[in-house]
From Swiss-Prot:
GO biological process terms on file: tRNA methylation; tRNA wobble uridine modification
Coiled coil: none
Alphabetized UniProt keyword annotations: Cytoplasm, FAD, Flavoprotein, NAD, tRNA processing
PANTHER family listed in its UniProt record: GLUCOSE INHIBITED DIVISION PROTEIN A (PTHR11806), PROTEIN MTO1 HOMOLOG, MITOCHONDRIAL (PTHR11806:SF0)
Protein name, as recorded: tRNA uridine 5-carboxymethylaminomethyl modification enzyme MnmG
A Gene Ontology molecular function term of the record: flavin adenine dinucleotide binding
HAMAP family: MnmG_GidA
UniProt: NAD(+) binding residues: 272-286
UniProt organism field: Pelagibacter ubique (strain HTCC1062)
Length: 623
């Protein structure tokens, strides 16, 4: 064995979870190492060349508010910025960008390879080192023995990964890249519940062989909505995407060849993502539809590769070619690389604490697709939380937990560790009970101070954030003191009830058609700082009434939700609970009443029995 190396925190895996985990740990001043198969694939976008979207964009803004790396890299590599749901309210709008795949990888690598407190190694891990129920290090392919205080495992689709193209099966973690083998089997010895999930990707097409003439064009937004609160301007030329559709002939080709699909031949055992189905699944499950939309997304400014979003498949390559050649615009298209399905191991996330440390092995943290999620953004958000908590734990500080009213990150992690997954988990705005307050626009106001408190935030970001808060405070104070009567406001063509009650300017701002420009016509003493500050004031005013009620709901809920469940509760002795409920409580061991309530299959009645028991015990202790 070669000379030992020792680090305080080690991250295994250089995907989106691994990048955020390593960066977060390093930002907290911890001597951190990142181990990956290849340094040149750090930050690789394995599937679609895009970041963000509905729910996902919120996660990236929250990552950025906590000084994560994904938002900045997405902005620097963005080649088509679009704000989804722009016509709807800010609570459900989703920032998204098409990224240049090579630029994204380049900027992520530049960032991490120059990150303070972070060392990066290209050396696959082959064996963990355990000391009873504690992980203490690992051995690498080159024969190195690495010791660590905390270990974060972010293997993505590499854990016993298996690629399917028709009846061909190839062990791989990604196209032309070897999987991680043997690691699952080591964890299995500690009775981890390990399952198989599946995801897929479409064939890559040669843009030079596509006829674009009659295809609908989708343009970038003229006024880009960036992911990072620090980004001031767009760096890249903005491009268009094109749209085309499947048709009845294509559907017949797929139906005729279903048995040749790995999905329908019985080759694949893993469950795929419901919200990102293969084209085979679409044809079978939505047989009434005569066409399905396909977005032709360029993979880069200097790249001829097109990602046809909407036709993920595990059909044989010859069938993929036939399908493509019967789609409008793709009649003569050349496939650069076939689409495929990939199966991989995941660990039941109910095996984790909210810190993402495993319950069965101390000092071992899991983040990303190994926890049953799908998507770059979901992985990155978990990486951030695992990295923060591994570092804080090493420093013997309190854990960093975001709850469901704090962030979409908190919603996701709570869902994972309490409910587990039956299919790859994807974030949506509908998953958040408090989505009116968990908006993309206010992620910094919700989270940056929390990051400052634990030493996670850079001086640059802290200064910019505090300056923004100061400006918002100045305007809010003046507007809270500026009053006007219904009679006087009428002269400005603003209609309100003639009830003689004076209104504050922030109340007037909630009226239809009123913006900050109009407000300054009435109160010219209100200072103007910049467009972003005005937009934030307008959004805050719009949601003011709703948020006041929601805040009361959150406080009421938290009174019982945050009630801690003693570790010594004997669920088997609680009368009124079914054996199934007792088994779930014993398996998950919820820390709080709120966590108990969100366990899949647990009824409010069962939680009430537990709540009554905990409160009775508390009263006895006080007495």
């Amino acid at each position: 064995m070669k000379n030992d190396l020792s680090f305080e925190v080690v991250v295994i895996g250089g995907g989106h979870a691994g990048c955020e985990a390593a960066a977060a740990s390093a930002r907290l001043g911890i001597n951190t190492a990142l181990f990956t198969h290849k340094i040149e694939t750090i930050g690789e976008m394995s599937c679609n060349p895009a970041i963000g979207g509905l729910g996902k964009g919120h996660l990236v803004r929250e990552l950025d508010a906590l000084d994560g790396v994904m938002g900045d890299v997405a902005d620097k590599s963005g080649i088509q910025f679009r704000l989804l749901n722009r016509s709807r309210g800010p609570a459900v709008q989703g920032p998204r960008t098409q990224s240049d795949r090579s630029l994204y990888r380049k900027y992520m690598q530049e960032k991490l390879l120059n990150y303070c407190n972070l060392s990066v190694f290209s050396d696959p891990v082959i064996k963990f080192i355990f000391n009873k129920n504690t992980i203490s290090g690992f051995e690498t392919n080159s024969g190195k023995k690495i010791l660590c205080g905390k270990l974060i495992l972010t293997t993505g689709t590499f854990l016993n990964g298996l690629i399917h193209i028709g009846d061909e099966r190839t062990p791989a973690g990604r196209f032309n890249e070897k999987p991680s083998t043997g690691l699952s089997e080591q964890l299995e010895k500690y009775d981890f519940k390990i399952g198989r999930l599946k995801t897929g990707t479409p064939p890559r097409l040669d843009a030079r062989t596509i006829k674009y003439d009659n295809l609908e064009e989708q343009f970038a937004d003229e006024d880009p909505y960036f992911f990072s609160f620090l980004t001031k301007k767009n760096l890249n030329k903005q491009i268009s995407c094109r749209m085309t559709y499947t048709n009845e002939k294509v559907h017949k080709i797929i139906q005729k060849n279903l048995k040749r699909s790995a999905m329908y031949s019985g080759s694949i055992q893993g469950v795929g993502p419901r919200y990102c189905p293969s084209i085979e699944d679409k044809i079978v499950k939505f047989a009434d539809k005569d066409r399905h939309q396909i977005y032709l997304e360029p993979e880069g400014l200097n790249d001829h590769t097109i990602y046809p979003n909407g036709i993920s498949t595990s059909l044989p390559e010859d069938v993929q070619q036939e399908i493509c050649n019967n789609i409008s615009g793709l009649e003569n298209v050349k496939i650069i690389r076939p689409g495929y399905a990939i199966e991989y191991d995941y660990i039941d996330p109910r095996e984790l604490f909210l810190t993402l440390e495993t319950k069965k092995i101390q000092n071992l943290y899991l983040a990303g697709q190994i926890n049953g999620t799908t998507g770059y953004e979901e992985a990155a958000a978990q990486g951030l939380i695992a990295g923060i908590n591994a570092a804080l734990s090493f420093k013997k500080q309190e854990p960093f937990i975001l709850d469901r009213s704090d962030a979409y990150i908190g919603v996701m992690i709570d869902d994972l560790v309490t409910k587990g997954v039956a299919e790859p988990y994807r974030m949506f705005t509908s998953r958040a009970e408090y989505r009116l307050s968990l908006r993309a626009d206010n992620a910094d106001q919700r989270l940056t101070n929390k990051g400052i408190e634990i030493g996670l935030i850079s001086k640059e970001r802290e200064d910019i954030f505090k300056d923004k808060e100061k400006k918002l405070g100045i305007i809010s104070k003046i507007m809270g003191e500026s009053l006007i009567s219904p009679t006087k406001i009428k002269s400005f063509n603003i209609k309100i009830a003639k009830d003689g009650i004076l209104r504050k300017s922030n109340e007037i701002l909630t009226q239809k058609g009123v913006n900050m420009k109009k407000i300054r016509e009435i109160w010219p003493e209100i200072p103007y700082f910049d467009k972003k500050i005005d937009e934030q004031i307008e959004i805050n005013a719009h949601y003011r009434g709703y948020l006041k009620k929601q805040k009361a709901d959150i406080l009421a809920f938290k009174r019982d939700e945050n009630l801690v469940i003693p570790e010594n509760v004997n669920y088997d002795d609680l009368s009124g609970l079914s054996n199934e409920v007792k088994a779930k409580f014993n398996q998950i061991k919820p820390k709080t009443m709120g966590q108990a309530l969100r366990i899949d299959g647990i009824t409010p009645a069962a939680v009430y029995i537990l709540l009554s028991h905990v409160k009775r015990k508390s009263i006895k202790l006080i007495a």
